[in-house]
Amino acid sequence: MCYKVEKQRKIEQKLAEELKNVPGFIADFFDRYKSSATKKINWIYIRDMLNWMLSNGCIKKDSISDITVKDMNDITSNNVIKYLNELKNGILGRANSLDSINTKKNVFSAFWNYLRQNKCVDENVIAYIPKNLYKSEKKFKEVEIPTDEEVEEFLKSVNDGNKNEFNVIRNIAIVQLIKGSGIRSEELINMDINDLHLYEEDRPYMMILGKGNIEIYDKVYMSERAKMYLEEYLIMRDIFIREREITDKALFLSNENKRMSKGAITSFFERYSDGRIYPHMLRHWVGTDLYNRTNNIMYVQKQLRHKNLETAAKYYVHIDDQDVANAVYLL
């Protein structure tokens, strides 16, 4: 069983344990979600909201396990607004951003819709919350992309900044793989050794369980340069696991003889770039460079596995007003 699937299985087991004493009409809502991580975070949102309703007398029961269908019908939109306002104003801890508030509001709306569809409640109380109450001014943020010079300077720091040869070769291979494929760091740490396919076809590739996926693998190509550095790392990795008798199938291993963590990758990026470069910036670098080389946004969407062209275009297609004016003038 691959690491990501095993991790999802453990999340499912823990969640099942937490939901064991939760009324069925509430617990069944989470079966609608495919991703274990989504189930977990949505359960936390619902759990915290219901606990607040209990603590504030909106539901007159001792615990979530005692909640009935009638109790859910007693909750009003004003109760939910008060809860969301306390989150926004930091009364319940760290203040939530408007984006975070809207995410939770959307989960609550889906939850009440589910209850209404199953005839547990008469209406979706979230629908009565004014749409603009938690509206945030969404401003498009240009992606941060390091220059070629900054990337080379970063690689030099990675090469010179660590006396441990295994760490150096591994870290450079990680940087070159992200830079040569656009893979996400979360996807990278989930990779096992057998996910690499360097020689089966004319072009090297890897099989990736993408974002939010535990069943369907994506075929992701890599650059010749990334392949070259991976080959060097794989020789070092083979020596490393034989000397330490490691059986872990993880592609990238730590000095603790286990799979590298996402935090470890973020940490060495920050350390050797003085905080100027982080892994996702290299993903943006790939998208920009690939678009500039091909002028084909569909290549970018395919390689970076964006859900739609609009997302890819928003980040990587930059249109100059004067170019538009000149083109229209010639119509």
Where are these regions (language model features)?
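DNA breakage-rejoining catalytic core of tyrosine-based enzymes
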Residues: 136-155, 213-225, 241-242, 246
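Short basic/aromatic active-site micro-motif
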Residues: 169-170, 258, 275-294, 311
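Conserved tyrosine-mediated DNA breakage-rejoining catalytic core shared by Y-recombinases
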Residues: 186, 190-228
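N-terminal core-binding DNA-recognition domain of tyrosine recombinases/integrases
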Residues: 6, 24-37, 44-141, 161
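Active-site/catalytic core of tyrosine-dependent DNA strand-transfer enzymes
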Residues: 223-276
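Short, polar N-cap/turn motifs at the start of nucleic acid-interacting alpha helices
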Residues: 198, 275-276, 295-315, 321
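A short, glycine-centered helix-capping/turn motif at helix boundaries
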Residues: 119, 177-190, 293-295, 306
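Basic, Lys/Arg- and aromatic-enriched nucleic-acid-binding interface segment
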Residues: 152-185
